[in-house]
C-alpha cells in the first residue's frame, strides 16, 4: 500500500497552488459559519491552533511549503497550518485557516488570523492559543490589540526559564519576563498551576503548568485557568 506521504504527493499534483487553495478553503469556511455568528451581536471565545504534519519526503514544487520545528515523529520538517475557531456551547466552529510557509513568523500568522476575524465582524471575548505561538512578538501583538488571552508557556531545557516558577509550593499568580535576544524583554502576567497526576501525565507525583494571561478577572483562581484552557 502507498505511504501517507506518497498519497499526499499524488493529491498535491491535482490541487491548485497554496494561495489559491487557501482562498478557496476560507471561502468555504466563511459560507459554513453558523448564522448566529454572522449576526455580530456578541463577542466570542476563540481558539487559535497550530497544526504541524510530519513530512519525511522531498519538498514539493515549492520549498516554502515545508517548515521546520521541534523534532516530532522522527523529523523536523512539517507541513503547517493555523486555524482560528469560535468556541460556543462546548463546540468549535473553524472560521479561518492560514497555511504556514517556511520562514514566516508566528506573529504574522496570528495577525493575519485576527484581521480575518475583524473582516468577518467577529469580536473577541477571550483568545486561547496553542503553545506554539508563545513568543515575544506574538505577545506584543496581543498587548497592542488589547486582547484578553490564555497561552501556555512552553517548558524548554532542564533548568532556568519558566522552571523557576515551579519552585513554589503551590499554584499561584505571578509576573514572568520573557527574554528574546532578537525581540527584547517582555513582562507578562502568569498563572502557575500544580496538578497532582494520580497516574496521569505518564508519571507519578505532581506536574506543573504555566500560562501567560491577560485580562483575567482577579477572582479567577489558578486551578480555574487550567480548567478554562482545557
Describe each region flagged by the PLM.
Residues 33-37, 68-74, 139, 177-180, ...:
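A generic local secondary-structure boundary/capping motif
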Residues 4, 18, 22, 135, ...:
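Alpha-helix initiation and N-capping motif
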Residues 19-33, 107-109, 211-229:
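Short, motif-level signal for alpha-helix interfacial/capping segments enriched in acidic residues
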Residues 145-230:
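An anionic, glycine-rich sequence signature occurring as long contiguous blocks
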Residues 103-164:
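Domain-level cores of phosphate- or acyl-group-handling catalytic modules
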Residues 1-3, 42-56, 84, 124-134, ...:
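Short, conserved catalytic/metal-binding motifs centered on acidic residues
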Residues 66-123, 205-216:
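Electropositive, glycine- and tryptophan-enriched low-complexity nucleic-acid-binding patches
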Residues 8-88:
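Active-site-proximal, Lys/Arg-enriched surface segment
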Amino acid at each position: 500500500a502507498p505511504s501517507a506521504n506518497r498519497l499526499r504527493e499524488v493529491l498535491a499534483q491535482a490541487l491548485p497552488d497554496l494561495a489559491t487553495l487557501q482562498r478557496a478553503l476560507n471561502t468555504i469556511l466563511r459560507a459554513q459559519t453558523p448564522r448566529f455568528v454572522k449576526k455580530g451581536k456578541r463577542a466570542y471565545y476563540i481558539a487559535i491552533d497550530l497544526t504541524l504534519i510530519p513530512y519525511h519526503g522531498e519538498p514539493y514544487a515549492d520549498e516554502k511549503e515545508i517548515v521546520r520545528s521541534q523534532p516530532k515523529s522522527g523529523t523536523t520538517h512539517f507541513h503547517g497550518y493555523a486555524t482560528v475557531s469560535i468556541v460556543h456551547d462546548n463546540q468549535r466552529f473553524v472560521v479561518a485557516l492560514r497555511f504556514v510557509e517556511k520562514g514566516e513568523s508566528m506573529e504574522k500568522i496570528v495577525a493575519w488570523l485576527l484581521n480575518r476575524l475583524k473582516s468577518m465582524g467577529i469580536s473577541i471575548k477571550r483568545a486561547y492559543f496553542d503553545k506554539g505561538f508563545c513568543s515575544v512578538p506574538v505577545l506584543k501583538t496581543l498587548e497592542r490589540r488589547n486582547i484578553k488571552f490564555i497561552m501556555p508557556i512552553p517548558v524548554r531545557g532542564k533548568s532556568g526559564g519558566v522552571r523557576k516558577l515551579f519552585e513554589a509550593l503551590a499554584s499561584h499568580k505571578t509576573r514572568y519576563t520573557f527574554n528574546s535576544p532578537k525581540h527584547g524583554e517582555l513582562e507578562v502576567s502568569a498563572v502557575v498551576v500544580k496538578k497532582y497526576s494520580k497516574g496521569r501525565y505518564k508519571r507519578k507525583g505532581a506536574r506543573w503548568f504555566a500560562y501567560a494571561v491577560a485580562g483575567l478577572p482577579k477572582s479567577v483562581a489558578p486551578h480555574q485557568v487550567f480548567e478554562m484552557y482545557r
